[in-house]
Amino acid sequence: TCAFDIIGAKFVREVENGEIVYIENDELKSIKPFPPKKVRPCVFEFIYFSRPDSILNGKTAYEYRKNFGAQLADEDNIDADLVVPVPDSGNAAALGYAEKKGLKFDLGLIRNHYVGRTFIEPSQQIRSLGVKLKLNPNISVIKDKRIILVDDSLVRGTTSSKIVKMLYDSGAKEVHVRIASPEIKFPDFYGVDTPTKKELLAANKSTDEICEFIKAKSLKFLSLNGLYLGMGFDKRNDNYPQSVSYTHLRAHETRSD
């Protein structure tokens, strides 16, 4: 909905599932010609994709992400000096975490806004270079601090491992990684670029193994229940929109290879 602000339009409401909205004789009208279906929104819109100032189900994406950070703080008991976001995707969650814990929030990483998203780049080499180009450590903030590093999600681990090393190289005493969403263990066939299960770190490693892989002092993901609480959604909404057969999964992985 942030696009409406740019062009000076007024946001009235969201178009509902299966709804047709049209204008007739300068009057806004709506019909629902299809049988009602259970709402099954893409959770990644709330976690990552939507711009923070866009509205989803009556709240901004920013509000949801702050909620995720606060829920994660409720589930955590680590002691640290500072909460640092992975900019810009982790900003809202890190702020929610810091406010809930009563910890200092600071910008330990400075982002170059002329570099795009790294986890959706096509090759590992390009993704690794993208992290170095996109983020630079703010040494005056980081040095000699026990840091809680908050990000919105962990997909391949590309960004997290590079950032953890960057923080330690800049003098951080400890780096505790906190992810404001649950583990991503399965591919999505509706737009998220996670082609195969083998590319998803959480599909192939335990939390302890991922922590060792990214070289963090500790690692924690938001629980599924924490995600539901942060969204204000019923847990029964979490089924995939349609069944995906094992044959389809295997064919998809073969094509990706």
Regions found by a protein language model. Give the residues of each.
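N-terminal segments that mediate ammonia production and transfer
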Residues: 1-90, 98-139, 147, 233-238, ...
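Active-site phosphate/pyrophosphate- and oxyanion-stabilizing loops and adjacent acidic/basic residues
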Residues: 70, 95, 208
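Short, well-ordered alpha-helices that flank and scaffold nucleotide-derived cofactor binding pockets
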Residues: 74, 95, 99, 165, ...
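Short acidic/polar active-site loop segments enriched in Thr and Asp
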Residues: 81, 173, 217
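Gly/Ser/Thr-rich loops at beta-strand to alpha-helix junctions
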Residues: 87-93, 156-158
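A conserved beta-strand->alpha-helix junction
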Residues: 105-116, 213-231
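PRPP/pyrophosphate-binding module of the type I phosphoribosyltransferase fold
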Residues: 130-203, 207, 213, 256
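Conserved small/polar residues in nucleotide/adenosyl-binding loops
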Residues: 247-254
